[in-house]
A protein has these predicted regions:
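Short, surface-exposed, polar/charged, turn-prone segments marking secondary-structure boundaries
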Residues: 45-46, 124-126, 135-136, 186, ...
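Selective recognition of hydrophobic, aromatic-rich stretches within alpha-helical transmembrane segments
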Residues: 2, 56-90, 137-174, 204-240
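Interfacial aromatic "cap" segments that immediately flank transmembrane helices
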Residues: 2-35, 93-120, 155-208, 244
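Short, small/hydrophobic-residue-rich motifs at membrane-helix boundaries and re-entrant hairpins
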Residues: 3-12, 16-87, 101, 106, ...
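Membrane-proximal helix-loop-helix units in multi-pass membrane proteins
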Residues: 117-146, 150-151
Length: 244
């Protein structure tokens, strides 16, 4: 059995994979970001309108859920792009739309499951935000709910980071089987997932200082590194020729 690769080695492989493809990776990330931004603008304006009726507000929240799912499936296309790159397969901007044009029921179903799990984790936060204030007699309840939501969200983050990767990689498994398999894969790898995420904090701070422009470089690097972590966990990475 091949030993697990360290974060430094995964990042080296990722830089090699991105060499000569950084412009394409930036374009893919920018495409997803702009679609997300412009699709959300009309509904953000609707909620920001002080004269918005209750019906309009309800429409906004329904639209937000639907858009979140659509953008999530778009993000799955971004994952597929990086999987193709890591596996030395052809990668192009059209990979972003792969999940809409191929077995869309599977990919939409998978993301709806993931979205539902995420919303369950956020439920205490939503309750606290809408029913309680951080002042007066309800402050303690609000803080407890915020803390509970933070803990649940963290659990989701560390338990299911490989779920969507599995859905895209294992056509032989149902979306529910991918869910249980993702939990099996994370065993013994939680600290690796946390470390990879923490190691990019410094770069993300620089992205904030650059008003987000730095994300064009950092996001593809992070995505490719995490993709290689997934391939390492599944045992596929050692079989991939990492030569440029």
């Amino acid at each position: 059995m091949n030993p697990k690769k360290k974060s430094k080695e995964l990042k080296r492989i990722s830089r090699e994979n991105l060499n000569g493809r950084y412009r394409l990776s930036m374009s893919v990330f920018l495409t997803v970001t702009l679609i997300n931004l412009f699709s959300d603008l009309p509904f953000t304006y609707l909620l920001g309108n002080v004269y918005a009726t209750k019906v309009q507000t309800v429409i906004y929240y329904i639209a937000e859920v639907l858009l979140s799912i659509v953008v999530g499936v778009l993000q799955m296309g971004l994952i597929r792009f990086h999987l193709n790159m890591a596996r030395k397969k052809e990668c192009r901007i059209s990979n972003v739309f792969y999940c809409f044009m191929n077995h869309s029921n599977r990919y939409f179903g998978a993301y709806i499951i993931y979205y539902a799990i995420s919303m369950i984790a956020k439920a205490p936060f939503l309750v606290a935000r809408n029913l309680f204030n951080l002042s007066g007699d309800t402050m303690g309840i609000a803080i407890a709910l915020y803390a509970a939501s933070a803990v649940l969200s963290f659990i989701v983050l560390v338990l299911f980071p490989f779920y969507l990767y599995l859905v895209l990689s294992r056509d032989d498994l149902s979306v529910f089987a991918c869910l249980t398999h993702a939990i099996k894969l994370i065993r013994g790898n939680i600290l690796r997932v946390i470390y990879i995420n923490v190691s990019f904090i410094g770069m993300l701070v620089l992205c904030v200082l650059s008003l987000g422009i730095g994300l064009l470089w950092v996001e593809p690097y992070y995505e490719q590194t995490f993709t290689n972590l997934f391939l390492d966990v599944t045992g596929e990475l050692p079989t991939v020729d990492c030569a440029v």
